[in-house]
Amino acid sequence: MKDFIFEPINTNTIQKCHELNEKNVPNVGSRSLKGLTNSLENSDYSECILFRDQVVGFVICFLDNEITKSYMEQIDHKNFREISNRVSNFLYIDRIAVDIEYRNKKLGSQLYSNIVDFSKNNSITSLTAEINLLPSINISSFEFHKKFNFYEIDTVKYSEDYEVSLQKKEIN
């Protein structure tokens, strides 16, 4: 882990985060570079993992507050809306990705540990996320989130080819 650098996403790393995001579709939703940059600019927590100046992982999160709700309404973010109708005082993990060559090295776990620390320091009581069921079920994400004591609070089917599992973890 000592060779990996964890730092906030910035203008120098957003392009590489976007490339990594697109390599992980359909496990994460596709976003344009402009859309991902817009998310970053409106996010409350972001972090990327660098290894030899290469982005090998990242996460972008949003707090449950009026500014975020307004932004999410503007971009019609259905998953955030569904979670905010069911949970309060949460940090929403909008997207996380780790390069396939760097998986099983505890990098995603370290990102989540950092998110938990941020949440505790900001009196946040829950972490939330969604996991794709359709167009393809993201089994590795279910297994990963289960290790962090996430549980399903509901499923939402938006169309014949898009369904998600809404997930929650209590912060102690």
Model regions: which residues?
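A short beta-loop-alpha structural element at the N-terminal edge
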Residues: K2-E19
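Active-site rim helix/loop that mediates acceptor-substrate recognition in acyltransferases
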Residues: P26-R52, I60
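Conserved acyl-donor/pantetheine-binding loop and adjacent beta-alpha core of acyl/acetyltransferases
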Residues: I60-R95
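Conserved GNAT acetyl-CoA-binding A-motif
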Residues: L91, S119-P135
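A short, internal acetyl-CoA/4′-phosphopantetheine-binding micro-motif in the GNAT/acyltransferase core
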Residues: D94-R103, L133
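Conserved acetyl-CoA-binding loop-helix of GNAT-fold acetyltransferases
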Residues: V98, N104-S119, K147
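Conserved active-site alpha-helix within GNAT-family acetyltransferase domains
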Residues: N121, L133-D154
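C-terminal "cap" of GNAT-fold acetyltransferases
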Residues: D154-N172
